[in-house]
């Protein structure tokens, strides 16, 4: 599951972590809560100096009326928008993705190897115009014309378009990878290109989408709209475009230049593991605590 790498690394660093425990943290310690039963009432009586809540769900917990100050750890930076809209007092830190599930140590490029030409991540709340167009063209069971054209250009590619995100699970379930995060990660590790979409009108477009890190860690070349936060971390190893009409040409170029693609994929994998994995976030735990003590009153 998504939290595994983060919690495993915390334990390795010497922190005591109790999950779904009926006992409360000791006074003066740091409490880490992961989906505990009735966590809100437990938090109110927790004697811990700081109470961290790990939220792996895309939408926030409902804790209106909670007097304690919780600190949220989440893979989804977009969650901050939800908490701010609800006027919930909190601090939030992104703990990245679990590269145990999503990291593929080696990406294979060889003639005849079956790869998927496109893994398309639709935004959870709003799809891209390109995705809408593909949906209308594909029908219920037909492959996308875009995938077909890519397949015609490169005989090693088997045409298929994958969509990920809640928007697509009802509309085009046959195009959504199914299963556990590890199973989806294996699908991504067999992908050639992952197209990540972040609606430019939302705060997510100014942050690193979780899908970007997951796809990069799994060994797919990421192509996405221009995003300064992603550019700062990944540099030119994530491909970006200003106009959606440029997207098919970029896909064609990188499909026909696998060595260039491979170099960017390997570099993006390493960046993800070093900077955005949940284990990397756990190594910053002391830094997070120091910041809280200096800047926030519990």
What positions do the PLM features span?
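A charged, aromatic-enriched C-terminal amphipathic alpha-helix characteristic of glycosyltransferases
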Residues: 256-290
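Nucleotide-sugar donor-binding catalytic core of glycosyltransferases
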Residues: 1-28, 35-46, 55-236
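Generic C-terminal helix-cap and adjacent flexible tail
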Residues: 290-298
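Conserved acidic donor-binding segment of nucleotide-sugar-dependent glycosyltransferases
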Residues: 238-245, 253-258
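Short, hydrophobic/aromatic alpha-helical segments in well-folded domains
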Residues: 68, 211, 250, 267-268
